Amino acid sequence: MANHLLIGLGGTGGKVLREFRKKVYEEFRSNEPTNGTCINYLYVDSSEDDLNSREGWKVMGKYVHLKEAQKVSIHGLDMNKFQNLSLYPGIKCFLNSGDIDLMTSKLGPLVTAGIGGQRRRLGRTLFANNLASRDGSDFMSRLKQAVQAMQSQTNDQQVTFHICAGLAGGTGSGSVVDTIAQIRQEYRPQPGGTQYKVYLYLYVPEINVANASHDSGFYQANGYAALSELNAMSVGAYYPYDVTGTMDNVTGQVRRLCEGFEPFDAAFLYSNVDEAGKTLNLAKALPASVADFIFQKTVLSAGTGKMARLDGCENDGAG
């Protein structure tokens, strides 16, 4: 029995999880697939409204919203922490003096509100702040709980992680690198590469911004910066700090992660324009299309046809 953990980062990732849940219910009349596939979910967001909203989570007369244990709120950041950063090495390690000045003098309302606000550095800070809590509702605690639940249910240690995020905003774009790094630190690739796989499904900002109100000046720049970091990770040129603040015993500094192994197995990039040139609605049609693709990869049999060729390319490059 296959285990798959779908992780949604920010609003875009949350929409993909929503549409995936609806697809599962449409096919099986149940929140869980009944064909031997085990699916679990983790939705990470800085917006409490989005995390708790049930709007759009209804299909065929039934709500398919996530359980509380499948949500991670990275909302909220105490401004006083910037005055005592030495106590929070997981945050201090990646902030420079300019970042600190910007957050304390100009981004105060965003920081106090605890939202990404289309600022990648703020999104990363919120994610690191969440990891510092270790109160059972933080990302790593919820991640381990989700993985252990699947492994116990299926008696199978193999887990595939599917990370969904948009690269234009602050939360998804700012947290995707550290999400990958933390997963890989806890679930490292095993010999043969079959036990823990990590796939990325990333929305690349549209060339012509669909809604001008969505762009506060960093929309496309965020996408470029995130892709640059992910590319550097994939070729071994960039090893992210461990934002939990764990120190390296040799250097005495916050350790770096993902050295010596592949951070992820494949990254699927998509925009709001399909191969036929048709523009898809960002709120529903686009996340539904991505959810359909993931559904094909995870729930339906990939033994034949185009999906088998795709799996072949991912596993050994043979196609």
Residue ranges, per PLM feature:
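Terminal, contiguous helix-loop blocks that mediate binding/assembly
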Residues: 4-8, 12-22, 26-160, 167, ...
